[in-house]
Amino acid sequence: MRSLFRALVLAGPLIAAAPLAAQDDTTFSAEDVFALEYADDPRISPDGRTVLFVRRSNDIMSDRTEGAIWMVPVVGGEPRLVVDGASQAEWSPDGRRIVYSGRDSNDRAAIYTRWMDSGQVQQVASLDSGASSLAWSPDGQWIAFTSNVDAERKPLAKMPKKPEGAKWSDAVKVIDHAQFRRDGRGFLDPAFRHVFVVPANGGTPRKLTQGDFDHDGPLSWSRDGRSIYFSANRNEGWELQTVESDIYTVDVGSGALSQFTSGSGVEGNPQVSPDGGRVAFVCMPNVKRPVWQIDVCVKNADGSGARNLTQSLDREVGDIRWGGNRAIYFTFDDRGEKKIGRVSLDGRVT
């Protein structure tokens, strides 16, 4: 697990800051934000030798955070640029390719793969909305992802035909959902997040989930490649249930859904064990208390034996990863420091 520790350390501090203009006042100013850069989203190669990460920078011209995929040896060395203007890199199971999200020549959201030996890049698909939660199938033949699909909305009234050359005001915005605005984004376009699959060699994405619900990643494939785990709140009153989600599986062939968890509260971030026998996930019971805490839970792949493994730990769990088939590593904050913990399947935390 030494590679995991190195990758997590890599993601923490700022990796670079562009030189600031010489000035007498060294107080951090608003403009200095555009000089900051940091490393994010590390991914270790299957052979444990290389770490991919996203180098984030803030563009003063567009007022946006931009991403570029870089790589660095696990043992240390000089980072090298892999792809500019891209993010969400994921290694293929054999380590020969990576998949990532970016923009195509028409500035549309797109998914690409890159052969790491030759540098050859192939566009897998163009999308109307951005792709998230990219995940390779175990055999490397498919890529799963989530993407927003515009919701169908009936107009409030039938508008008259607009004369040629007329300059009308924007159409009235009809809001009929409780969750219509978010901090940092403003008003939300009516859309729902769905799970898709696309051939890794390119093709037409196929939508697996249906209904007016958000289906969230990260995504995790079953070891036989027949189904995909994800989280969602598919209850009728989901918009008013802010602390509720369950884990589902969707059959890749038929699109049939099966509910894997049904506890009260949040259950998400499913991670299938290497042998496929268990599924780890984060859980947070919806109970009436002043403070909620996210824990590590595990359940057998057949749906039996659900357990909370970190209930005795007075810390909130962050990201989780399997360490073999008998333990789960997780991140947590402790008095201002980011730490890594390990919990065995019998609940021993170290």
For every predicted segment, state its role.
Residues 23-37, 205-208:
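A short helix->beta-strand "capping" segment at the edge of beta-propeller domains
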Residues 31-67:
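Beta-strand-rich domains and repeat architectures in extracellular enzymes and scaffolds
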Residues 73-77, 115-119, 199-203, 251-255, ...:
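Short loop/turn segments that connect beta-strands within beta-propeller blades
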Residues 44, 91, 136, 221, ...:
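Residue-level recognition of a conserved intra-blade site in WD40 beta-propeller repeats
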Residues 18-22:
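Sec/Tat signal peptide C-region and signal peptidase I cleavage site
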Residues 7-17:
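Bacterial N-terminal signal peptides
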Residues 48-51, 95-99, 140-143, 225-229, ...:
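Hydrophobic beta-strand positions that form the internal "hydrophobic ladder"
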Residues 55-68, 81-88, 101-112, 120, ...:
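A flexible loop/linker signature enriched in serine peptidases of the S9 family
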